[in-house]
Amino acid sequence: MKIVAFTLVAFVALAGASCPYAAPAVAPAAAPGYPAPPCPTNYLFSCQPNLAPVPCAQQAPAYGSAGAYTEQVPRYVENPSREQLQRFHQRVGMAALMEELRGLGQGIQGQQY
C-alpha cells in the first residue's frame, strides 16, 4: 500500500513539474443581484413605504361588535337521517363484500390443478 501511495505522489509531482501551467489570480467577486430600475410613478408600488391606516368595517347594529367581522357560513349538507345512514352502510358493506368475492374469484382462477 505504501508503494502505491509513493508511486501516486511521485507521478503527481512529475506531472506538476512538467506542466508550465500557473493558476490564475482570483478575480474579485462581483456584487450579487441586478440593478434596480428607476422608480417611476406608474408602478403599483412605490419606492418608499406608504402605509395609511384603513378604517374598520362599521358595526352591524343587530349583532353588536361581532357584526363587522362575521358573515353567514353556507350549509350545503344536512345531517343524514337514520334511514340514509342505514342505506349508506349497506352500500359500503355490499361493495366490500363484492370486492372480497372478486379477489377470491381471481385467486381461484390463478391456481393450477
Curated annotation (Swiss-Prot):
InterPro entries: Vitelline_membr_Cys-rich-dom (IPR013135). Residues 1-17 form the signal peptide. It is found in: Secreted. Keywords: Secreted, Signal. Residues 33-70 form the VM domain. Belongs to the vitelline membrane family. This is Vitelline membrane protein Vm32E. It comes from Drosophila erecta (Fruit fly). The lineage of its organism: Eukaryota, Metazoa, Ecdysozoa, Arthropoda, Hexapoda.
